[in-house]
Amino acid sequence: MRHYEIVFMVHPDQSEQVPGMIERYTGVITEANGTIHRLEDWGRRQLAYPILDLHKAHYVLMNVEAKAETIEELETAFRFNDAVLRNMVMRTKVAVTEASPMAKARDERDSRRGPAGERSYDEAHAEEIAE
């Protein structure tokens, strides 16, 4: 079996259907004895250029280990799903399991913000010192 990195972009109006799509696509891979090494839902992001007059899309990243036939089946599913705006499947040499730069940036941003969007202790303390 080979390793693949898969990114697909979903129409922003269909964002609520993304968890079901992820479940369906991961099911296709696991039923064919494939392995999912990394799965990241990046959420809605700004597009670099408009696609079908849309400026945002819902991004999903998967790193999987599967047979070529399974990947072909997945690409066919992408092609016939109108909600999938774009998809990219790249073969990789090794399984990638570490968090992507996008996920790391989100985690860092969330940790600075603190629970429920509160400012961190450092930010609040810096304001007190400045006063």
UniProtKB/Swiss-Prot annotation:
Biased composition (Basic and acidic residues): 104-131
Stretches of the chain forming a coiled coil according to its record: none
Annotated InterPro entries: Ribosomal_bS6, Ribosomal_bS6_sf, Ribosomal_S6_plastid/chlpt, Transl_elong_EF1B/ribsomal_bS6
Domain of life: Bacteria
Chain positions covered by the region annotation Disordered: 97-131
Molecular function terms, GO-annotated: small ribosomal subunit rRNA binding; structural constituent of ribosome
UniProt keyword rRNA-binding, yes or no: yes
Pfam families: Ribosomal_S6
Record-linked NCBIfam families: S6
Designated name of the protein: Small ribosomal subunit protein bS6
Lineage of source species: Bacteria, Pseudomonadati, Pseudomonadota, Gammaproteobacteria, Alteromonadales
